[in-house]
Amino acid sequence: MKRLSLVTTNRLSPHGNFLPLCTFPLAVDMAALFQEASSCPVCSDYLEKPMSLECGCAVCFKCINSLQKEPHGEDLLCCCCSMVSQKNKIRPSWQLERLASHIKELEPKLKKILQMNPRMRKFQVDMTLDADTANNFLLISDDLRSVRSGCITQNRQDLAERFDVSICILGSPRFTCGRHYWEVDVGTSTEWDLGVCRESVHRKGRIHLTTERGFWTVSLRDGSRLSASTVPLTFLFVDRKLQRVGIFLDMGMQNVSFFDAEGGSHVYTFRSVSAEEPLHLFFAPPSPPNGDKSVLSICPVINPGTTDAPVHPGEAK
């Protein structure tokens, strides 16, 4: 079963059937609370016949036997907080069952309302790839918009900003404030990482894509496993395979959102994105051992229009 990653009220915005950009972070905060309360930490699905543990966490009735047992005993360990619950003190939670049921009923309406706001494209940025940061296994197009992995290392200068082990590259320009939107054509690629990162991230040695290390990325593996770089990973569900990914960065609200740019549906939003230092687009195609030589491309800006907000220093013009 697929679950929404965004929840809001059923009141339509004055901009049509789309959320105003200023309310997007609030809607995402609401979504996190609803998701946490209505989903099972064992099966990651909506709670069915939820059972409340002594610690206050809840799991589906069918998932109770999947919980780890206490060593040398029959009591159960919560998979969220590792607290022990006695079997005879686990009780049904009717309130959570009603909440999960209501969210499931609202899902079709929410999907229709929570599509990508076309106004985001007014903030579309003309971006290119920064060749000085590219790993030497990457092959970059002459216009600096497309990249794929090769099997032969390129003879590039050894620069401090270049990634020497991990197969990735950053984008230009960097961002220090404002709102910015761009799209990446991932085509039929079965593996990629997209998002933003701090300017100060480590470039040498193998990197780990986590928010704690300054990476706010969405990743695809094996053609179908989609995840966000939270700790622990957040696994994502989409109705269709992503072929063009839209990314909206709002430095003022400290969030970055990912969309299916063709279908218009919301994929995931990171909150509390650090704005203390410049951020760069992060871009990683399939690595050479994968055998996938798909090209990932930054889509050109087409009639971006003008923004409602003034352009500030550090913002792309």
Curated annotation (Swiss-Prot):
Residues that span the membrane, as ranges: none
ZnF RING-type: positions: 40-82
Post-translational modification: Phosphorylated by PKC and CDK1. The antiproliferative effect seems to be positively regulated by PKC phosphorylation and negatively by CDK1 phosphorylation.
InterPro entries registered for this protein in UniProt: B30.2/SPRY (IPR001870), B30.2/SPRY_sf (IPR043136), Butyrophylin_SPRY (IPR003879), ConA-like_dom_sf (IPR013320), PRY (IPR006574), RDM_domain_RFPL (IPR022723), SPRY/PRY_RFPL (IPR037960), SPRY_dom (IPR003877)
Domain comment quoted from the record: The B30.2/SPRY domain is required for the negative regulation of cell proliferation.
UniProtKB keywords: Cell cycle, Cytoplasm, Metal-binding, Nucleus, Phosphoprotein, Zinc, Zinc-finger
Tissue specificity field: Seems to be expressed in prostate and less abundantly in adult brain, fetal liver, and fetal kidney.
Subcellular location: Cytoplasm; Nucleus
Domain B30.2/SPRY span(s) in chain numbering: 107-301
Full protein name: Ret finger protein-like 1
Primary localization: cytoplasm
Native source species: Homo sapiens
UniProt record, GO biological process: innate immune response; negative regulation of G2/M transition of mitotic cell cycle; positive regulation of proteasomal ubiquitin-dependent protein catabolic process; regulation of gene expression
Annotated GO MF terms: ubiquitin protein ligase activity; zinc ion binding
Function: Negatively regulates the G2-M phase transition, possibly by promoting cyclin B1/CCNB1 and CDK1 proteasomal degradation and thereby preventing their accumulation during interphase.
